[in-house]
Amino acid sequence: MLVISAGKNEIFDFALPMGVGLVDMAINLTKFLQKRSCVGADEKSINLKNIDPRYLAKIEAKFANSSNPELQNLSQNLSKNPGQNLYQMPEKIVFVGSAGLYKDGEILQIYESSVGANVEISSIENRSYSPIECEISSIVSRGTIKTNSSNFITTDKNLAYKMFEKGYFLENMEFFSVLKVAQIFKIPAYGIFVATNFCDENAHADFIKNHSAAKELLTRYVKENM
């Protein structure tokens, strides 16, 4: 099992930071999984003992020498247990992080989700459309809660309610990318979220106010249930 987070202000001792937002998360998670598959943790289950250790060292060095500080931190975390973490494809991916509530729900409550979307506010107002897939369901079911992802945080309560009417319960910046990458690699994935705010004019202030308590709650939940 691979547990990941966005990183920056959401660092956990049990999760690898992969990047904030849709783009960084997609790039870094893809790089991470691709390096594992290149090592040989594919359907053929190549025996790692037969692989030249110098080749494995080169792969790990690419993480350490990256200009991306999150990948450098990831390399340091991997070195604690390289046999388990670096050279095997995970049986599932669990993303942990904070989320906003569109309408219903409670602050500092834990929610699990295995359905992610990338629906922009402009499409709710019929000002845009997308010709590509905008919603993904993981091959592992974790309830019916749908999580929408965007690089922009919703701060208009009326628009947030419209998102809720469309079936979306949570807002998190990275989750859609996690599910999309996991889908490509055919890995089950789901998210564990703690609500820090409602998506309204107080979204940022409430996020700041509740974030420390949210991280503690999420840490306790993960360590007690996983």
Which role does the model predict for each range below?
Residues M1-L2:
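Extreme N-terminal starter segment of soluble prokaryotic enzymes
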Residues E10-S37, D52, L86-M226:
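Glycine-rich phosphate- or other oxyanion-binding loops that anchor nucleotides, phosphorylated ligands
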Residues Q34-M89, S122-S123, R127:
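Intrinsically disordered, low-complexity terminal tails and inter-domain linkers enriched
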